[in-house]
Amino acid sequence: MIKVLHVITSLYTGGAERLLVNLLPLLRDSGNQVDLLLFNGIETPFKKELLQKGIKVYSLSMKNDVYNPCNLYRVWWFLKKHRYDIIHTHNTACQLFVPLSQISIRTESKLVTTEHSSFNRRRSMWWIKPLDKWMYNRYASIVCIGDKSYRNLSTYIGKSDSLITISNGVDTGSFIRPIKQILPGQQIVITMVAALRVEKDHRTVLKAMLHLPDNYRLQFIGSGPQEHVTSMKCLCSELGLDDRVTFMGVRQDVSDILEQSDVVVLSSHWEGLSLSSIEGMASGRPFVASDVDGLREMVGGSGVLFEHGNDKDLAEKIQWLCEHPDEYRKVAQRCQEKARQYDISITAEKYLDLYHQVLNS
């Protein structure tokens, strides 16, 4: 049995958070002790789901101040009391505070981290690079979720034997649905599943609605910082789209909502390996995504890519798919076939193999 602690800032909506909800029970069911430590333990649907699945969840605080220096002491105190074979971090604050806290603790715990994005604004700040290089050097293994993420991190910290790639995964069986048939003149429902954060490009999808007929409807699933949510809702009103766009917030019935949709979209400025893209591609609906790093590798050759930030190009490609039933069906089929390659069971097996390799090295 391996004792594993995963550490993440919170369980708000996001790809890394959703990965843990799917991954941790599988790691536990393989005969291991798998716990989770949150910097911000505020109650969320993801936290509730993990607790219902029997995962032990610890919290450092109930505040959204993950970079608070007090968290360094809190991590140190927690790791002093609890011993694990593997400590697996996610997100920058956790990646930094965990190795810092270990400096004064005599422990044999091996550190593993996952890079969940192909882009990080910190890497443009030259004065942070020495700290980042020290931080990454403390890890026995650094998991990148895609080829672009791997290349970008290799360029930043230099080539290292500790860098590997393990793709994210989802429970594809929960999302696989029969491919839908589009009927002439029917209402078309477009769905985008993404946290309302700066890296996502909801603005372009909203503006694309201005180029689509009135029978096209749009729904956003996800939440985020209140100021960003408010900004997008204000833009929706300014564009006169309030009667055609629905902000649905965080939902636990995403697979059912995708089943009722006709086209799934992900508009983003950058991505790692998006779990919502895998879910969307598994749903039996054509998947249309921004032509950006992370999505390009995932969607290219299966779904449809549109020019980053080009609302007219997005609208044209959505409408073309819906007006050409044969192509609609072919794209949906290709998307489902691609999604099956990213089942969470495959991801779990690769992480378990990695843990054994790290402990035996």
Residue ranges and their predicted role:
Residues A289, V304-D311, W320-P325:
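Conserved acidic donor-binding segment of nucleotide-sugar-dependent glycosyltransferases
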Residues H6-C70, G224-E227:
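N-terminal strand-loop element at the rim of the active site
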Residues G14-P25, M192-H211, T230-S231, K312:
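A conserved mid-protein helix/loop that constitutes part of the nucleotide-sugar donor-binding site
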